[in-house]
Amino acid sequence: PTIYHWPEALAQAADMTVTCPGCSMHYYYDFIHPETEAHHCPYCTTPRPQVLILESYRWKGTDTPLELPCWRYVREIPPGSELTVPRRVFDEFLMLDSDTAEVLISSGDEGILIKKSDHAKADVSVAADSHPQRGFQTVYSQMKIDRATPDVQFWMFSNMNSPRLVKCMISGSDK
């Protein structure tokens, strides 16, 4: 890409890397080690840690099928930690505020907690199979999703400048 596009390209690349808990090196989350044929670090073969994978799709309405994700954001999410999800997951990439926190996600044995950031501009709604009420529910302050299995999936919807449907998956270290 030309220099004008470097910030976005570098952010996209960085957003798809994880840090190895064994050697602290960074690598792409979907790397499959040729020796182990599993998601292991390419440098020391330590299994990939538990990760949160967010795939952001441009929403064009219910009559239009989803295209390929326009953004992917992947981070390690150890139990008990809180992960900051930046604005670029919910809207177009902008140099000035793409790193601004929109949502905070924490994972524990009892469930997933989704909280709006103090600086959030997005109106976020969440839908999950494990949530007692079916369909999308608006997150006013925070929302809890029950964790029935180690690998959890839920959806977030944001209607900013460019409406986004975000598929959220928590994947264990053995996946």
Question: Which role fits each region the language model picked out?
Answer:
Residues 20-23, 38-44:
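Short cysteine-rich clusters marking metal-coordination/redox-active sites
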Residues 13-16, 33-37:
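Residue-level signal for mature regions of secreted extracellular proteins and peptides
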Residues 16-25, 53-56:
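Disulfide-bonded cysteine-rich modules in secreted/extracellular proteins
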Residues 116-119, 125-175:
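C-terminal boundary/linker segments immediately following FHA domains
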Residues 26-35, 48-50:
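Cys/His-rich microdomains that often coordinate metals
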Residues 1-18, 49:
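Terminal C-lobe "cap" of eukaryotic-type protein kinase domains
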